[in-house]
Regions:
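Active-site-proximal alpha-helix that buttresses catalytic centers in soluble enzyme cores
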Residues: 1-120
Length: 120
């Protein structure tokens, strides 16, 4: 099975924010050089989620979507699933799975502590 990973961010009109996200995805690609990894934005920037899904579907039969969102709010609970449902209808043979947001992962507490130390 040809698997791809799509990392999704909210999106921003500000180019520096878009570039920051792209750099993060690039670093993740470096960590996993054999994996097919792409990025997309929910809104305000490109590629959009549908654009990225279409591109990945050309060579991948399974797409794992990782939302780079902190909590399970409306975007993760409703908006992204709606986009994935529309894609599945258009590509019935495609296997698309949506991962969980970052959530209350204990590692986030360590990051908060680190940020606090930098302020002290």
């Amino acid at each position: 099975m040809n698997r791809a990973i799509l990392i999704v961010a909210h999106g921003s009109r500000e180019k520096p924010a878009q570039q920051e996200f792209k750099r993060l995805v690039g670093k993740y690609r470096q960590r996993h050089p054999g994996w097919k990894i792409a990025h997309a934005f929910l809104e305000m920037a490109e590629p959009s989620i549908p654009q990225a899904l279409e591109s990945l579907a050309v060579t991948s039969s399974e797409i794992l979507v990782l939302p780079l969102f902190l909590f399970t709010a409306k975007h993760v609970r409703q908006h992204i699933p709606e986009i994935l449902t529309a894609f599945r209808k258009k590509h019935p043979g495609a296997k698309v799975k949506l991962g969980k947001p970052l959530g209350a992962d204990p590692q986030l507490l360590d990051i908060l502590d680190k940020r606090l130390r930098h302020l002290s």
